[in-house]
Structure formats: C-alpha cells, structure tokens
Amino acid sequence: MAEPRVGVVVVAAGAGARYGADVPKAFVMLSGRTLLARSVAAALGCPGVACVVVVAPSSYLAEAEREAIGSAGATVRVVPGGVERHDSVAAGLAALPRDVDVVLVHDAARATTPSSLFAAVAAAVAAGAPAVVPGLPVADTIKQVDETGTVVETLPRATLRAVQTPQGFRRDVLERAHAARLSGSVTDDAALVEALGLPVLVIPGDPLAHKITTPADLDRVVGLVDSGGADAE
C-alpha cells in the first residue's frame, strides 16, 4: 500500500486581538523569525508532507507568501482566510491538492511545535484513526461552574487533556465534518468530527507546542528558543 500523502493547513488568518500587536499575531517576531515562518518550517520538516497551505488575512497575503517560502520538496500555497476560524480551515482544505489523503490543521500561534509532533499525528491517522489530536495531561484542578459561578462538579484530572495542534484527519472525514457544520462557534476541528459521532484519538502532545496568545506567552518561549530548547531553524 502506498504511503498516504499529507497536506498541512496552517491557520494564520486571525487578527490576534488578545495579543494586542499592530500586526496579525502570525506575523509577530520570535527571536528573529515570525510565528508563521516557524510554523511552516516545522510542517515542512514532517516526512511525507506534500503540500502546505497557509491561510492568511486578505490584507497580508504578500507578507504571508514571503514568510512561508519553504523547501523539502513540498509546495507552499497562500490563500485568504474567512470570517471565522472554521471558514479559514475550509478555505485551506479546499486549496489542498486532490491527492492529499491526510490533512493536518495547525495554528500558526503554536510556533515552537516540533516536526516530530506533526509526524506522530500523521502516523496515527495513517494507521487508521479518522481523527487524531495531541494532548497533555491537565495539571490544575478543573471545576465546572454554572452561570452564577457556583461549582457544579469537579472534573477528574485523569480523564482530561489539554489539546494542542496539529490535529490530523482523514481528508474525507474532515470534509464531511465541515460540510455538516451547524451554526455556532467551534474552537477546533476535532469538535466538528465529534459532532458526526466519529471517534477522535488523543495521542501524547508535546510541551513545546505552546499556544502564543499574549505577549507574556511569547516571553515564556523566547528563552526556550534562544537556548536551543525549541527548533530555531
């Protein structure tokens, strides 16, 4: 059986309002390189990746093309994003070549994610899982509360995971999930697959797959990158 062809959708279309920069968050610098450039490099470092599609703000397409230039035999494309995250993912999915079998969806804000995590997610999908997400055990106690702030339940930590990206899917599954999406906001593509009633496998995540949401998050990873703890290539 031929190895599946892997395509990566890098979501970089958000305005990054919580970050508060004068550019979209994907174009914020981290030790001399943008978050977008680092995320694309990590995706290209995954064996078997045939295409990377960057979904960028329509007013930053030229900048995204400059930052997303890659090698390793993969094709890099840049397309404009939509109003909501799911619109942007759908645009990236539609731009992938038709012979891509496995789709990884990655947030550009997780710019220190190692290529090995991309490879692990892709391998789990290739092994038969329709949808795969990386996740880390939760260290804090998590309490469910009602609309008044009163605790309803303390959730068992052993059953909880903090989910990261890239998230991986069989292409047909992700296309079905987006086609069937109902109104309302979703925070990740795995939730759309869950709504279809299909299983989503969680594999071990990586502490390096930080999501940079605020300047404080960026400060926390600068030292890691500068010390070589995260891939700076």
Ranges and model annotations:
Residues A2-P4, L96-D101, A126-G128:
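Glycine-rich phosphate-binding loop signature in dinucleotide/nucleotide-binding domains
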Residues S58-R66:
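Short, charged/polar "capping" segments at the starts of alpha-helices
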Residues I69-V103:
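Short phosphate-binding loop-to-helix
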Residues R85, A108-T112:
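Acidic metal-phosphate-binding loop of nucleotide-sugar-dependent transferases
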Residues T113-L201, E233:
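Conserved core of the sugar-phosphate nucleotidyltransferase
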